[in-house]
Amino acid sequence: MRGDNVPDLEREAASCEGCPDPAKETAMIDKVLLEQAWKTVRGAVRWTPLLHSDYLDSVVGARVFLKAESLQIGGSFKMRGALFRVSCLSEEQRRHGVVAFSSGNFAQALALAGRRAGVPVTIVMPGDAPQRKIELTRRAGATVVLTDHGTRNREEVASERARALAAEHEYALLHPFDDPLVVAGQSTLMREVQVDARRDQMHIDAVLCPVGGGGLIAGTALAEKHFGQGAEVIAVEPEACDDMRRSLISHRRERNVGTPQTICDAMQAVSPGAVPFEAAEHLISRGITVDDGAVRRAMRIAFEEFKIVLEPSGAIALAAALERRDEFTDRTLVLLCCGGSVSIEDLLRLTSSTH
């Protein structure tokens, strides 16, 4: 791994002078911005490994590599987008502080990025978010506000509360995925994969990417467009919330009704974000889904074969490779294992019954 020591983000902010206004059109997520994000983020995060197993290759019938982003600072890929977004704040925004809504991973990442930059952070989280994620966000230094969503979508309710707090306290309102600067930050994950692949003279045929709001897959697809070798980028979602798959078919953003029931709690967005969907719709080849049982089995295999802990959302790409193996015969796959924020109690509960 590289870059375990995160530098002072007040100094790093200088590298983001001239950052575009996130409110403007998504055409700004170009090669120049992606390079800017790469220069800012690559020395401020862990360079997470690509893991390989001959056993997994034999099971899937393909050459399979896991990008173990569960080992990232903060436990997920969200650290990349949070670091770059915070580095682009104005001095006035830094003084007032920031607010965001999140079910957990962006919450912790933004809290850590804000603490290192000296920026006050308030996070609005659903009251039913995993207790472990709430505790870790508070431990990272953020003020946490919990919401009760009732029968409504929990992300929608948390988003409304965050907007109200931003207006009341003059906080900068940051979105966990619907922001071009966050998307650019997330693109650095795929940049690492590309560097490692070139070093090992490996041609990647397909990248299986988890999708919640779409920030990671948009960054991945854009990085592959500008710096890659033409790998197919495939969206992976739980059966219960396949809004990206449906959106790719209809060519418009489809919504989930209520809060989808799935163990993949980090993937319960209302719909794909406008920014990531517009930026990457034409770059994503297709969407596929898997059920929660497949995710449970993938979590167990990740632990037993690779000795890594994945949360459900972090294991879903592996689940797709295993469950839909006939689609990937003799190909070289990279599975983006995007996070590992799960308590030991939940890990044992979710993996003890994998029928």
Model-derived features with residue positions:
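PLP-dependent amino-acid enzyme catalytic core
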Residues: R11, G18-H355
